[in-house]
């Protein structure tokens, strides 16, 4: 996608040296665009855990390049066996992280150490290219849903939660890809953007993305979604996800479950957009089996923004003697999901439908 007319991916190998890794620091958006240069797997791990990069597909791609940097420094078996668990420990909920690392480990184990650095960069690049193609396909399938809702309507109002746009993937995004394509196709779409406390990915990332693309949007507070649904001002909900079980349960940013409940109560279709790499075929019960990341209380008790004089300011918004809990994700049961938008099409959120859509993956896991 483009920033002020310049095309970007969210991660790439530096053109100057052809080995270091460049990312867009998402903690600085929307106020500044900073592109740090990462040269070690430790820097990659920090970028993931501190959320300089976030979004399930992107952290998988970033971790893949972390392995490549490690193999450039030391291609031994010991180094490979050390870097994979180190990177895997950075974020526990998103399955794409583990998927990408396991793919890298399998690919590199087939090469002698002397070939591993080149092979690692090639595999990481392939993961990135495949992500772009996958998200484009997700967008095309989701576009059909939006086009169908647009029949006989002046405008299609879509609510989204958190950020599942191009900055959360290598390009295009998952939940936002159909919206971009609908806008580009001339469909009158308008997006209600949840602020998404406590890290505010809605108003700091999704609103920024949509604005750069020219998509009409309105930022709303997290608790307003149900109100707009009751008033008939939401035609559909599209969100992303960090992990989907084989039975269709969905782990996504905290607050997603409440949106799904409100959508069900008001007859609003609730869709989840995802690449197949986000499906965890090893578990069925999302609530009982998906690990939920607990992040620092400071993300809840403080907030950062731009002061009127242009300076950046972090302030405490919670009384100093109050504690804060900060689960980063919740689980939406499959029964509340109208459909899963994948790169192969749209399917119901249940084990039979997922296995029919991805028989190769389901059989491979069963074996």
Curated annotation (Swiss-Prot):
User: By what name is this protein known?
Assistant: Methylthioribose-1-phosphate isomerase
Role: Catalyzes the interconversion of methylthioribose-1-phosphate (MTR-1-P) into methylthioribulose-1-phosphate (MTRu-1-P).
Gene responsible for this protein: mtnA
Which one GO biological process term can you cite for this protein?
L-methionine salvage from methylthioadenosine
The family annotation for this protein states:
Belongs to the eIF-2B alpha/beta/delta subunits family. MtnA subfamily.
Positions of the record's site feature: Transition state stabilizer: 162
Xref: PANTHER family: METHYLTHIORIBOSE-1-PHOSPHATE ISOMERASE (PTHR43475:SF1)
EC class (word) = isomerase
Q: Which cysteines are joined by disulfide bonds?
A: none
The UniProt record gives the binding positions of substrate as: 54-56, 91, 201, 252-253
Q: Which organism is it from?
A: Acidiphilium cryptum (strain JF-5)
């Amino acid at each position: 996608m483009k920033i002020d007319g310049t095309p970007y991916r969210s991660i790439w190998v530096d053109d100057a040296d052809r080995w270091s890794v460049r990312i867009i620091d998402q903690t600085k958006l929307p106020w500044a665009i900073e592109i740090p240069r990462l040269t070690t797997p430790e820097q990659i791990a920090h970028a993931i855990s501190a959320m300089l990069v976030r979004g399930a597909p992107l952290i998988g791609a970033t971790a893949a390049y972390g392995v490549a940097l490690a193999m450039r420094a030391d291609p031994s078996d010991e180094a490979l066996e050390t870097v994979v668990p180190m990177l895997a420990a950075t974020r526990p909920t998103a399955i794409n992280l583990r998927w990408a690392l396991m793919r890298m480990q399998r690919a590199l184990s087939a090469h002698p150490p002397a070939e591993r650095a080149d092979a690692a960069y090639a595999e990481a690049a392939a993961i990135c290219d495949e992500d772009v193609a996958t998200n484009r396909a997700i967008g095309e399938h989701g576009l059909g849903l939006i086009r169908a809702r647009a029949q006989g309507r002046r405008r299609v109002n879509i609510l989204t939660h958190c950020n599942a746009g191009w900055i959360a993937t290598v390009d295009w995004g998952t939940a936002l890809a159909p919206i971009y394509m609908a806008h580009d196709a001339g469909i009158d779409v308008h997006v209600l953007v949840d602020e998404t406390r406590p890290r505010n990915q809605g108003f700091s990332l999704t609103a920024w993305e949509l604005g750069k693309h020219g998509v009409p949007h309105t930022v709303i507070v997290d608790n307003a979604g149900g109100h707009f649904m009751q008033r008939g001002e939401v035609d559909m909900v599209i969100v992303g996800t960090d992990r989907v079980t084989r039975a269709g349960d969905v782990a996504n940013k905290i607050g997603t479950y409440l949106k799904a409940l409100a959508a069900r109560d008001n007859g609003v279709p609730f869709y989840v957009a995802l690449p197949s790499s986000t499906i965890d075929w090893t578990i069925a019960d999302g609530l009982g089996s998906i690990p939920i990341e607990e992040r620092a209380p400071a993300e809840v008790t403080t907030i950062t923004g731009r002061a009127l004089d242009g300076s950046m300011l972090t302030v405490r918004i919670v009384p100093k003697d109050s504690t804060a809990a900060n689960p980063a994700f919740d689980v939406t049961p499959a029964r509340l999901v109208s459909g899963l938008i994948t790169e192969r099409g749209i399917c119901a959120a249940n084990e039979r439908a997922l296995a029919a859509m991805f028989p190769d993956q389901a059989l491979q896991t069963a074996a």
